From Swiss-Prot:
Gene this protein is translated from: recF
Protein name, UniProt field: DNA replication and repair protein RecF
Major place of residence: cytoplasm
PROSITE patterns found in the cross-reference section: RECF_1, RECF_2
This protein's GO CC annotations: cytoplasm
Subcellular location per the Swiss-Prot or TrEMBL entry: Cytoplasm
A GO BP annotation: SOS response
Cross-referenced Pfam families: SMC_N
Family: Belongs to the RecF family.
Positions annotated to bind ATP: G30, E31, N32, A33, Q34, G35, K36, T37
Alphabetical keyword list: ATP-binding, Cytoplasm, DNA damage, DNA repair, DNA replication, DNA-binding, Nucleotide-binding, SOS response
GO molecular function: ATP binding; single-stranded DNA binding
InterPro entries per the UniProt record, alphabetical: DNA-binding_RecF, DNA-binding_RecF_CS, P-loop_NTPase, RecF/RecN/SMC_N, RecF_2
């Protein structure tokens, strides 16, 4: 799949922009704070209905405006699809082929993207929240039911936490048990989907990592749940373990006023040659692991939806050494529509970029003619 055009209205620093793209490589060039990343983010938001940079949708709307709009044309193997996302203070409304979607979960997944930004290099050494977000965003694209279960889980979690904060000195345990059972119902389904996804991701990421490391390293991805469950357990057993675990931490949760276990507390670990790369890995190994995961995402999405996703490389090439840079560009060459942001193409010598369409951005406008590198 590839996006052939995009329209932005009151989005970030773009007042009104219409732009067409090549189906292979598009390089967006400009100085910092001119709008390169905003343009890249707009493509991501069009696909995912949320930003990778902020959870506050108001920040996506141009200053002093009441609404923002992103509209794009997606070309797929057997169809052409119009996507539109309208953002206001009241929330977001999505359209597919001009038809408004009742739920965002019905919209997400139509256009698949893989974002690789400098913060993704922190996937290994960053906080557990970074890794959970990675899981949620990628899984949500290929499994709409996961997004539904996740949104329901988060609603119940918020209600349960409010109750826990208010419980000290009050007898509200009956209501707490109701929320606990609801949390277990949605949480176990989330857990199962994560186990399935990571099994597939492992199958793709391990050989990719082996290739980048010239056969010297073996990558293993391990899911670390906050309760003592495993992939081999069936759904009823997982629910049973969750229930027992919630009973054992109930008084601590009431004392602390928050939910202490569940998928929102889980984590991932990455092992290279049986060593925890987060703790013992070099910066090079950590970056190879992050790169392997991103390249594996591309192949996994293709295996699931039979279309390659759109790859967004936001100021990340300069963060990779020449070898990893070349491996990345060689892998995607000719098969994945790719967007690259950079302040300059100097020092990036690769055939893929020489054939790219370049877009020069300055102060929220496409400042000059589109040309070739």
């Amino acid at each position: 799949m590839f996006i052939s055009e995009i329209q932005l209205k009151n989005y970030r620093n773009y007042e009104d922009l219409n732009l067409s793209f090549e189906d292979k490589v598009n390089v967006i060039i400009g100085e910092n704070a001119q709008g390169k990343t905003n343009l890249m983010e707009a493509i991501y938001v069009l696909a995912m209905a949320k930003s990778h940079r902020t959870s506050n949708d108001r920040e996506l709307i141009r200053w002093d405006e009441d609404y923002g709009k992103i509209k794009g044309r997606l070309q797929k193997r057997n169809s052409s699809v119009s996507l539109e996302l309208n953002i206001s203070k009241k929330g977001k409304k999505a359209k597919l082929n001009e038809l408004e979607q009742q739920k965002l979960s019905q919209y997400i997944g139509e256009m698949n993207v893989v974002m690789f930004a400098p913060e993704d290099l922190n996937l290994v050494k960053g906080s557990p929240q970074v890794r959970r977000r990675f899981l949620d965003m990628e899984l949500g694209q290929i499994a709409p039911v996961y997004l539904y279960e996740l949104s329901q889980y988060q609603k119940v979690l918020t209600q349960r936490n409010h109750l826990l904060k208010a419980m000290q000195g009050k007898n509200e345990e009956t209501m707490l048990d109701v929320f606990t059972l609801q949390l277990i119902e949605h949480g176990t389904k989330i857990l199962q989907k994560r186990f399935e996804f990571l099994h597939l991701l492992q199958e793709w990421a391990a050989p990719i990592h082996r290739g980048i490391s010239r056969g010297l390293e073996e990558l293993e991805i391990v899911y670390k749940p906050s309760v003592d469950v495993s992939e081999s357990m069936d759904l009823s057993k997982i629910k049973e373990v969750y229930y027992e675990s919630f009973q054992s931490v109930k008084q601590r949760e009431i004392f602390r006023g928050t939910t202490l276990i569940g998928p929102h507390r889980d984590d991932l670990q990455f092992f290279v040659n049986s060593k925890n790369v987060q703790v013992f890995g070099s910066q090079g190994q950590q970056r190879t692991t992050a790169l392997s995961l991103k390249l594996a995402e591309i192949e996994l999405i293709y295996a699931e939806v039979k279309e390659y996703p759109i790859l967004l490389l936001d100021d990340v090439l300069s963060e990779l050494d020449d070898y990893r840079q070349s491996h990345l560009l060689n892998t995607i060459q000719g098969k994945v529509q790719t967007f690259v942001t950079t302040t300059s193409v100097d020092g990036i010598e690769h055939e893929t970029l020489k054939k790219a369409k370049t877009i020069h951005v300055k102060s929220g406008t496409v400042d000059c003619e589109i040309d070739r590198i």
